[in-house]
């Protein structure tokens, strides 16, 4: 195994651990500050969102009891598109706040190259929307939340609501649009990552870099494939509101990636909140503003107005 592959393996583990710590910290910081769920949640595990599909094309759904027409938050895991699992996404805190929570797996880059990942995410959204009545979900209040590679995919969900190319397979009569996007430090423009990395940060120009593995070729040699995978390519004024959170000393995904996304969203007139975690790396945030801003964001955009 060469040095670059060893480093990528380390990166995947670092991504998963730091993202998990960040999510766990956010949930611990807000848990118990609202009314408790009367009973344990209703849990559906490993629902196949593609009939007879890949083993990764499954999701878990958590529903608080005694609720109807629930707003839904869909959690999408990170892991450099090479690793990670839905089991690393904790649903409990937002169940207490009156949300349904789904967490999805998707095909990784070793299973299929891009656009398989966004196709899977959209298939999961369509499955949940097509079955909204069955699960007491409000089909008009779907939010998505992800970090790192998951941040990239939720940003793509937000900016490609009007792009039919990525909607393939089943439940095509319903939309894959979402109504709110919480993007934690997701890549947004692969070809600008190297120039803005921190000293000693990850090498994004290697043919073995996660971004190259995602598109199935060296990113420098495939600008058209890169553009197709970049969330900023598709931004239009009708995109949903975004919350972007990023540490300013992230060694894996440069902070500049979120600066680019914020600027492009603002230019298009899309509502966006961008919060920089001072001294923050690739997740693992203990800044109390992170869970506060995230909860306020979803409350504003997914909870029914009185």
Can you annotate each of these PLM segments?
Residues 112-133:
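Alpha/beta-hydrolase active-site loop
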Residues 109-111, 277-284:
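Histidine-bearing beta->alpha loop at or near hydrolase active sites
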Residues 34-37, 52, 192-234, 240, ...:
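Mobile cap/lid helix-loop segments that gate and shape the active-site cleft of serine hydrolases
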Residues 27-67:
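N-terminal cap/lid segment of alpha/beta-hydrolase-fold proteins
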Residues 126-197:
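Primarily recognizes the serine-hydrolase "nucleophile elbow" in alpha/beta-hydrolase
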Residues 69-80:
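Short beta-strand element of the alpha/beta-hydrolase
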Residues 85-104:
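Short amphipathic alpha-helix adjacent to the substrate-entry channel of hydrolases
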Residues 238, 243-246, 250:
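Short beta-strand/loop motif that positions the catalytic acidic residue
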